[in-house]
């Protein structure tokens, strides 16, 4: 599973990255987390407000910081959809 945190490196973006790390650990689903700071790539996802969270190419949150349990649910839902 591929998870991307979209944003220019602001405090909220860093916090979302930390929440995503905790959510991956909590969910037990193998995943890689990548920070995307390039404005062109962020724009390619249609994100108007950062931070953004992308799971397997799908934008699941934008302009807010979902907490660890919510992200863990997003991860397990995406993993179940792959099966």
Where are these regions (language model features)?
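Local sequence-structure signature of Cys/Sec-based thiol-disulfide redox active-site neighborhoods
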Residues: 1-19
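Short, ordered loop/turn segments at secondary-structure junctions
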Residues: 8, 38, 58
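Residue-level recognition of oxygen-bearing side chains
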Residues: 15, 41, 70
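Conserved helix-turn-beta segment immediately C-terminal to the redox Cys motif
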Residues: 17-32
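Thiol-based oxidoreductase modules, predominantly thioredoxin-like and allied folds used
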Residues: 30-41
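Structural micro-motif
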Residues: 46-54
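Non-catalytic, surface beta->alpha helical segment in thiol-disulfide oxidoreductase systems
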Residues: 55-82
């Amino acid at each position: 599973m591929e998870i991307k945190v979209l944003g220019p490196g602001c405090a909220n973006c860093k916090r979302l990255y930390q929440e995503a790390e905790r959510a991956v650990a909590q969910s037990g689903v193998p995943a890689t987390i990548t920070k995307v700071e390039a404005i062109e790539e962020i724009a390619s996802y249609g994100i108007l407000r950062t931070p953004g969270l992308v799971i397997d190419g799908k934008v699941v949150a934008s302009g807010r910081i979902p907490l660890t349990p919510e992200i863990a649910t997003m991860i397990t839902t995406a993993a179940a959809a792959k099966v």
